[in-house]
Amino acid sequence: MEIKYLLTVFLVLLIVSDHCQAFLFSLIPHAISGLISAFKGRRKRDLDGQIDRFRNFRKRDAELEELLSKLPIY
């Protein structure tokens, strides 16, 4: 019975430590690189590219809807 509790506590600690490691080694470097790119002005260019991709996506989506509306329904 005690082994089950010990195993459960070990797994919980393993999961928590994995999340903490992911937080420290993933979020902090991304935040630093985001600040650096914001100071250099790259963020605005990235947003412009995202807007263009979104417009292209909406255009392709409309074309797909038009194509599907022309197909016969079985």
UniProtKB/Swiss-Prot annotation:
Expressed by the venom gland. Residues 46-74 form a propeptide. One of its GO terms (biological process) is defense response to fungus. Residues 1-22 form the signal peptide. Changing S33K: Shows important increase in antimicrobial activity against E.coli (MIC=8 uM) and slight increase against S.aureus (MIC=4 uM) and C.albicans (MIC=4 uM), as well as slight increase in hemolytic activity (32 uM for 100% hemolysis). One of its GO terms (cellular component) is membrane. It is found in: Secreted; Target cell membrane. The modification Lysine amide is found at K40. The keyword Membrane applies. The keyword Acyltransferase does not apply. Negative results: does not show antimicrobial activity against the Gram-negative bacteria E.coli (MIC>250 uM). Does not show effect on four different human cancer cell lines. Belongs to the non-disulfide-bridged peptide (NDBP) superfamily. Short antimicrobial peptide (group 4) family. Has antimicrobial activity against the Gram-positive bacteria S.aureus (MIC=8 uM) and the yeast C.albicans (MIC=16 uM). Causes hemolysis on horse erythrocytes (64 uM for 100% hemolysis). Minimum bactericidal concentrations have also been tested against S.aureus and is four-fold higher (MBC=32 uM). This is Antimicrobial peptide AcrAP1. It comes from Androctonus crassicauda (Arabian fat-tailed scorpion).
